[in-house]
Amino acid sequence: MGENLPLLLSAALGKKVNRPPVWMMRQAGRYMKIYRDLRERYPSFRERSENPELSYEISMQPFHAFKPDGVILFSDILTPLPGMGINFEIIESKGPIIEDPIRTLNQVENLKELSPSESLSFVGEVLTSLKKDVNNEATVLGFVGAPWTLAAYVVEGKSSKNYSLIKSMAFNKPDLLHKLLDHFAKSIGEYLKYQIKSGAQVVQIFDSWAGQLSPQDYDIFAGPYQKKVVEIVKAEYPETPIILYISGSAGVLERMAKTGVDIISLDWTVDIEEACKRIPRGIGIQGNVDPGILFGNKESIKERIDNTFNKIKDRKYILNLGHGILPGTPEENAQTFFEHGKKLTY
């Protein structure tokens, strides 16, 4: 990979660094006025995320504003679905709507194999431009949704509070669900490889809804498919660091560590000292800062960052929030998060 690597990539690879890198999940988005202004001109989320010029511009907005150590592709975890024959729309304030939810064997068997270079070439274009223009001043990140979370969306047909439809499938027709999960694992593995080939230097897997599973069901329906995605990627790109994020993961941290990922991204509901004891030392840790703290004053933000970092100084760590930054967060508080984060030293 050569030396003079950007800080986040160096840290993710386990190299000695002077300070923890800092970026934020959803750092490009609604809390930024420049994004809201662009959204007025381009109200369709799918257009913003699938038009390469717009996706590139939005991805770069926080880089120009705050100079984070990571620049993440502006996209969505559902973006690869149409390439498998599953159409969706994202409705403002309602979230994603799947036009034809997947609930039968016939539907699963008729899903297309994902060919990222054909159906997702716009993603490749954006990542290639980001890699060139960021020019190692920051690390370019790609991301995907994990099989369980994608399945939850396509079976439920929309966001859900209790996941009754996919859980009904899990406990009544487990073979059908496993077939769907396996299809997603292969496709998502290929999609991640395409992102890396196009310019992503670190990638993150979001299994946002795996925290809705009991630990024993995580071992059946989520963990094995996360592992399969990781194995597909590592077979071709063994050096590329992979981060795994699950919302509500306090009950499954040890299980996450067994998937083969390099870094575990924590939400804010687990004490970071406890997490350090439960996650093997060879695995890095990211996040854990409550995004709600960014509604506080500057001193409370700085204090929380210091408090978090002091508990994890002897571990590989990437400063981040425990969830995406929330809409309505004051931009100057995001600025404080980045500025103070960059003052930390090992």
Swiss-Prot record:
One of its GO terms (cellular component) is cytoplasm. It catalyses: uroporphyrinogen III + 4 H(+) = coproporphyrinogen III + 4 CO2. Keywords: Cytoplasm, Decarboxylase, Lyase, Porphyrin biosynthesis. Pathway: Porphyrin-containing compound metabolism; protoporphyrin-IX biosynthesis; coproporphyrinogen-III from 5-aminolevulinate: step 4/4. Disulfide bonds: none annotated. GO terms for biological process: protoporphyrinogen IX biosynthetic process. The record marks 76 as: Transition state stabilizer. Pfam families: URO-D (PF01208). GO terms for molecular function: uroporphyrinogen decarboxylase activity. InterPro entries: UROD/MetE-like_sf (IPR038071), Uroporphyrinogen_deCO2ase_HemE (IPR006361), Uroporphyrinogen_deCOase (IPR000257). It comes from the Bacteria. It is found in: Cytoplasm. Substrate binds at residues 26-30, 76, 153, 208, 323. It is an enzyme of class 4 (lyase). Its EC number is 4.1.1.37. Catalyzes the decarboxylation of four acetate groups of uroporphyrinogen-III to yield coproporphyrinogen-III. PANTHER family: METHYLTETRAHYDROFOLATE:HOMOCYSTEINE METHYLTRANSFERASE RELATED, UROPORPHYRINOGEN DECARBOXYLASE. Belongs to the uroporphyrinogen decarboxylase family. Homodimer. This is Uroporphyrinogen decarboxylase. It comes from Prochlorococcus marinus (strain MIT 9301). The gene is hemE.
